[in-house]
Amino acid sequence: MDVLGPGQGNNTTSSEGPFGTRANATGISDVTFSYQVITSLLLGTLIFCAVLGNACVVAAIALERSLQNVANYLIGSLAVTDLMVSVLVLPMAALYQVLNKWTLGQVTCDLFIALDVLCCTSSILHLCAIALDRYWAITDPIDYVNKRTPRRAAALISLTWLVGFLISIPPMLGWRTPEDRSDPDACTISKDHGYTIYSTFGAFYIPLLLMLVLYGRIFRAARFRIRKTVKKVEKKGADSRLGASPAPQRKKSANGELGSREWRQGVENKAGGVLCANGAVRQGDDGAALEVIEVHRMGNSKEHLPLPSEAGAIPCAPAFFEKKNERNAEAKRKMALARERKTVKTLGIIMGTFILCWLPFFIVALVLPFCESSCHMPTLLGAIINWLGYSNSLLNPVIYAYFNKDFQNAFKKILKCKFCRR
C-alpha cells in the first residue's frame, strides 16, 4: 500500500536526495541511473522470490494429497493472495519506485490502489483466519475435529476477501480528498481522515489485536498441556517408587507342577543397615522373573534379598528401576521444556515478522494524513517502510509452509519432478 509515493516525502527543493535522488525545481525528485539500476535489481529479486515461493506452496498443496486438509487450505489461500500481491501489485509499485513518479495515468492509479489495499488487507486477514483455526484446534480439539470442514475454511476465506473489498472500494466511490488527485505524478491512498481511521483499523490494528489475543491464548493452552503431561509423568514416577510391586506369577507345567525356577527366601538381616537391591530381568519359559537379586550392605557382608512368595510382595522397589524411572521423568521434563521453547519461538516468529513488516507502515498511514503539512518523511525511509510491508508476502510462505516437514517433502518432489512422472 502506498501511503507515501516516491519523491513525495519532502516538498522542499534540494540538490541531492537520499539513495541517489535529485529534486528539481517543482519539488518532484529526479533519479540517477545508478539508483534505477540498484532499485530495479533489489525489487526485481524480491518480486521473483515472492512469486516463486508462493507458487511452490500452491503447487505443493494441489499435487500432494497428504497436504490437502483444512489447515493447509487456509495456508494455500494465503499463498494465492500473496501471489496476487506479487503479480498484480508489486510490478506497478516497483515501476513507480524506480521512476520516482507515476506514469500510468489516473485510472490505472485508482485500480492499482484498490488492488493494493484489497490484496494486502486480505493477506493480513488470512493470518487472522489461520490464528483462529489454530486457536479452535488447540482449545477444543475433540469438538473441532467435526467442525473443521472445507466449508468452514471457505467461509473464513470468503470473509477475508469481503472485508478487503469493504476497505478497498470506498475511495473509488468518492471517499477521498480533492488533494489526492492534484498531482498527476503521484499515486497515493486516500488521505481523508475518516477513511484513514476506517482503513487502518480495519486492515491492521483490529487484526493485530485479534492475533495477539489468539496466539496468547494458544501459548497458554499449549503450555498448560505440556506442564500437565510433565506432572502426570512425575506423579507416575513417584507412585512407582512408593507403591509395592506384585510378585511375578509362576506358570505351572503341563503336569501341574510349578516351574523349576526356585525363589530364594528367608534371609535374615541381623546387622541392620542400608540395603540396595540390584536385579536383572530375564525372560524364561515361565515368564519374566528377577533371577539374580543380591543385597549389598553398606558394611562388609553380602546377603540375598528376601524375595516374595506367590502371595507376597517385594518390600521395596529396586533401585535399578527407581533410577530408570527418574531418568525417564527427567527426559520427559527436558522434552516438555524443549516443546515449550519451540512453541514460544514459533509464535514469536509469526507475530514478530508480522509486526516488523506492517507496524511501521500503518503508523505512518495513520499519522501522516493528520500532520502532512508539518511532518517530514525522508524519501528513502518512506520507500523502506512501503516495501517492508510488501515483503510480508515473501516471508509468509517461509513461515507457514517452508518450516513444515510435509511441505519440505512436497517441495523436494517438485524440484525432482516426481509429480511429472506419474
Curated annotation (Swiss-Prot):
Entry binding sites for serotonin: 116, 120
InterPro entries: 5HT1A_rcpt (IPR000610), 5HT_rcpt (IPR002231), GPCR_Rhodpsn (IPR000276), GPCR_Rhodpsn_7TM (IPR017452)
Localization, UniProt: Cell membrane; Cell projection, Dendrite
PROSITE patterns on file: G_PROTEIN_RECEP_F1_1, G_PROTEIN_RECEP_F1_2
Any single GO CC term annotated in Swiss-Prot or TrEMBL for this entry: plasma membrane
UniProt-annotated binding residues for 1D-myo-inositol 4-phosphate: 345-346, 352, 403-405
Family affiliation: Belongs to the G-protein coupled receptor 1 family. 5-hydroxytryptamine receptor subfamily. HTR1A sub-subfamily.
Quaternary context: Heterodimer; heterodimerizes with GPER1. Interacts with YIF1B. Interacts with GPR39 and GALR1.
Protein's name in the database: 5-hydroxytryptamine receptor 1A
Gene label: HTR1A
